[in-house]
Structures are given as structure tokens and as C-alpha cells.
Amino acid sequence: MLSPKRTRFRKQHRGRMKGISYRGNRICFGRYALQALEPAWITSRQIEAGRRAMTRNVRRGGKIWVRIFPDKPVTVRPTETRMGSGKGSPEYWVAVVKPGRILYEMSGVAENIARKAISIVASKMPIKTQFIISG
């Protein structure tokens, strides 16, 4: 699963997801892509599950690019712990995704295969997405 090798700080504020994505909203590498339509945190497990499903469907010949990276730590407090005594420990990593962001790209396969693979990946994502073609 994806996570940063090292960060300057162990913990982050949650922040808020306002507006749309101005960066990473165009197809750069492949021909087909999966684009987010809603804001969400996408965990490294979800990203990895999508990547595996895509590679399994594309087989050989196709190339895949994962355009998001989980760089935000999410802290969780132990269960049945009283309030106070600091912030919880980092438990997992998420990528902050805004509407318009490209999640995955692929090329080297026919459109019907790409549609099938990307629809399977879309079902693994916690948000509404759309299939787009470059050009």
C-alpha cells in the first residue's frame, strides 16, 4: 500500500474540501481515465484495490497510471478512551480528492476493455466517478 517514506510532521489537521480540483484534472499520460465527481478522502487501501482490479482486467499490453497519492495521515484514538490526553496515533493514509481530479489513467487497450476495467475500479471507489477519453 502507498504511504510517504518520510514526512516533516507526524500528524495533520483534518482540513476541509472546498471547491474543485484545479490541479490533476486533465489526462496527461494515457488515453482513458477515471475522474472524480465528488470530494472525498480515498484511503491507500482503496487506491491499491482499484489498481489491482485494473491490472487484472487489462492483462498485458495495457499501461496504468495512478494519479493520486495518499499523503495525509489520519489519526484514530483507541476505543473506550476518555477525552483529552492528546491526539491519537496515525492509523492510515488518505489522498484528498476534490471534484474533477483524475484518479487513474490507462492506455494500450481497446475502449470496451478500458470501460469495463474502469467501471470495476469505479465500484471500489467511495465516490461518484466518470469515464473520460482524451482528445
Swiss-Prot record:
Say which species the protein is native to. Gossypium barbadense (Sea Island cotton)
One function term, GO molecular function aspect: structural constituent of ribosome
This protein's assembly is summarised as: Part of the 50S ribosomal subunit.
The family annotation for this protein states: Belongs to the universal ribosomal protein uL16 family.
Question: PANTHER family recorded for this chain?
Answer: 50S/60S RIBOSOMAL PROTEIN L16 (PTHR12220), LARGE RIBOSOMAL SUBUNIT PROTEIN UL16M (PTHR12220:SF13)
The answer on whether this UniProt entry bears the keyword Chloroplast reads yes
* Keywords for the protein's UniProt record, in alphabetical order: Chloroplast, Plastid, Ribonucleoprotein, Ribosomal protein
Q: Which InterPro entries match?
A: Ribosomal_uL16 (IPR047873), Ribosomal_uL16_bact-type (IPR000114), Ribosomal_uL16_CS (IPR020798), Ribosomal_uL16_dom (IPR016180), Ribosomal_uL16_sf (IPR036920)
Cellular compartment(s): Plastid, Chloroplast
One GO BP: mitochondrial translation
The answer, when asked if Ribosomal protein is one of the entry's keywords, is yes
* CC annotations in GO: chloroplast; mitochondrial large ribosomal subunit
What Gene3D superfamilies does the record point to? Ribosomal protein L10e/L16
Q: What is this protein called?
A: Large ribosomal subunit protein uL16c
Primary location group: plastid
Q: Which CDD domains match?
A: Ribosomal_L16_L10e (cd01433)
Q: Which domain of life is it from?
A: Eukaryota
Supply the SUPFAM superfamilies for this chain: Ribosomal protein L16p/L10e
